[in-house]
Amino acid sequence: MGFLTDWLTDWLKSLLIEGILGNLSGLFDTVNARVGEIAGEVGTTPAAWNAGVFSLIRQISETVILPIAGLVLTYVAVYELIQMLIDRNNLHDIDTWMFFKWIFKTAAAILILSNTFNIVNAIFDVSQSVIASSAGVIQGSTDISPDMLADLEATLETMGLGSLLGLWLQSIFIGFTMTALNIVIFVLVYGRMLEIYMLTSLAPIPVATLSNREMGSMGQNYLKSLFAIGFQGLLILLCVGIYAVLIQGIATGGDPIGAIWGAVGYTVLLCFMLFKTGTISKSIFGAH
């Protein structure tokens, strides 16, 4: 009878150990996969992310927003001319070079306005290039191999049946946290891209104010916002890369209970920091 009990206990222990290791290895595989997927999502330019949506945004911008921006630019140019004349002793000191200067500034403003989409795409091309370069470094340094679970398996074999059962239930809970993490990442990444499209659609209006010293703050802040949301992708990738390194430390720690709850804590921390990336990026570039 004792032999049968020992055999049944060993069988249950091996079954639970396989289940725990399977759940944890699935977690680590998910982490590796998410780093690669996020690198692809946040490193994609608006034109490449969804060509149909980008074409729609561009058409709306050029047919609806651009005429309004033309009126704004006309107002800015006239205001600039009047201000320039008044500043010269109320029209008493007028030089012909002033008009050449005004013509040059207006021509430059028209050129910039007519190439608004090229400027916007160039900004996102720069951020995409930086993200693509960083993705190779981050993903290459955070890969979690199955060999890292060997020490953890040895620790599990020394534990009792009750402890293993508790760990198995906890490891299932980890799967739900990863599902929640995937939802958060999906909302953040896709929400960021929709924000980019909305910013892009209204681009001509703030760009039309760039030539004026007093009103140019609108256009300057708009460009800062573009850089901020572009490089937010790098911060998102960096957060996931740090998370992967922390999870890697859990995998090699050899403490199964710590691995379970450490993963939960790191997942909650990652979700919090992902929502902070936008604020951090805007503070870096001075956008508001």
Q: Where does each model-flagged region fall?
A:
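Non-cytosolic segments of integral membrane proteins
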Residues: 16, 20, 106-202, 236, ...
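Internal transmembrane helix-loop-helix hairpins in multi-pass membrane proteins, together
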Residues: 33-65, 85, 89, 109, ...
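Alpha-helical transmembrane segments
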Residues: 207-224, 251-253, 282-286
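Binding/recognition "hotspot" determinant
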Residues: 1-72
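Hydrophobic transmembrane alpha-helix segments characteristic of membrane transport
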Residues: 72-108, 202-216
